[in-house]
Structures are given as C-alpha cells and as structure tokens.
Amino acid sequence: RGDMHRHTDLSWDGNRDGTLCDAYRYALDAAAFEYLGVADHQAGETDYTWWLTQKAVTLLTVPGRFAPLYGYERSLSYPNGHRNIMFAKPGVPVFPIPAAERQGKEGAGKLFEHLRAAGGISMPHTSATGAGTDWRDADPNVEPLAEIYQGYRHSYEHQGAPRSNPKLLTWCRRTRRRRSGHMIRRPRRSCTARAEKPA
C-alpha cells in the first residue's frame, strides 16, 4: 500500500503539501505506507532539488518496511503532459527537458532513452486535463503505468468519479480529437450539457 504522487513545498504548487519530512512522516506513521513516490514538479531538472529529494529517500528508507522511491514530476503541457519519473536507486543524473519537447514539437523519446539507460519508469497523469499526454510515444517498457487516481487532488477514472471535477470538459474534448484508449466518444454538445447539469 502506498502513493506514487505526493508533492512537497519543493513544488511550485506544493504550498499546501508540507515539507519532504512531513510527507515521509505521514507515509511511515499515519498512513502506514509500504512505499511513497514524492514527485515534486521539475525536481529532477535542478541539481539541488534532485539531490535533496534523493538524500531524503536514502535517509528514510526502512528495509523490509518502507521503500520510498527516487522521483520527480516532469511537467509539460499537452501533448507531452505531466509524468511522474521514478527510480529504484539514487545517483541518476538530472535530465533537462529538451526545448523541442517543451514546445510540443517532439515527444518523450529522449526521456524514454534516458529511463531505459538508468532503469527508471514514467507514469503519465492528469490525462483528463490540458496537462495530459497524447500517448504518441507509448512504450510499455518504460511507461508501464498510468495514474488514474490521485489521493489528494482530482480523479480521472471517469466523469462523476469520487473527487472528479464536473467542470473538466477536456474529457470530452480529448476524446473527440484523439484516440485515447477506452474513452467513450460523444458529441461536444452532449458533454457540455452533462457538465453543466446540476448535481
């Protein structure tokens, strides 16, 4: 039991999440987790935040009881989207986001090469928002998981799921433009009517 997507005050949106120490204290004590993936925005892009994150994981690993992962969140807009990047071991060098990928001109191919070489994995998430991915670079060897539920923020299993945001019309917009797995195709008018319907 655990969580693969927690933020701390190192993230640009982590002002309500607490410190790295708070995250691990919660995971070890209150939640009794077996694993935790802290995935602060762009923490793997700067040397200091990546070093600090790795140091916390190394210090707080409890063999046989608690296995935190070395990770960060790679945050881009659609079509490349947000991805949590996780490693089982420390010491993986910082991997900056190439300009062409940041601009959406290139996919995640270079990231995937880096992950294959370093033994890491990627988990796309926020798939129902403008920060989702278009799955153009799908590679199950380095991206074997996709987040569909966040314990702290929104859920993306389906519209109307617990903690889902009924105003997220991107569910429908995305299904009209892209083939996104198991989503149901509906006309835009139908999606808008459902989102605006009182609960």
Walk through the language-model features, giving the residues of each.
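Extended, charged catalytic domains and RNA/DNA-binding interfaces, predominantly
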Residues: R1-A199
